[in-house]
Amino acid sequence: MELELAAKRLAELGHSTRLAIFRHLVRCGPSGCRVGDVQRILGIPASTLSHHIGRLVGVGLVEQQRDGRILYCLPRFDAFNETLAYLTEECCKGSYASDASCPPGPLRKKRSNTR
């Protein structure tokens, strides 16, 4: 992933309304949520919601699909996971800290003890 794309995605998620929208879509799961439901649940005016969704679509974090007259927003988990991986891929690589001081689990891969 390029630094510029990561920065753009993080900047868009840095806005409280867009972060609330994205978190709601993540809660809805891979099948997404109707735009009208997002508007009702989050209490965001339609024009404002459209603007913020457009920004998230623009950086690839959200996809829109139409089913007849109903518009759905789907979180792009692949793009979000790619962004998270970019943030954590260098975790503790330049550190002489013990494994105990590095974040556990998916934030870093286990170091090999082979030399």
How does the language model describe each region?
Residues 1-5, 23-27, 77-115:
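Amphipathic alpha-helical dimerization/coiled-coil segments
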Residues 4-45, 67-80:
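N-terminal helix-turn-helix DNA-binding core of bacterial DNA-binding proteins
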Residues 8, 58-59:
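A generic local structural motif
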Residues 40, 57-58:
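Alpha-helical residues within the helix-turn-helix
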Residues 44-47, 109:
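Intrinsic disorder/low-complexity segments
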Residues 53-54:
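Short, hydrophobic-biased segments on the C-terminal half of alpha helices
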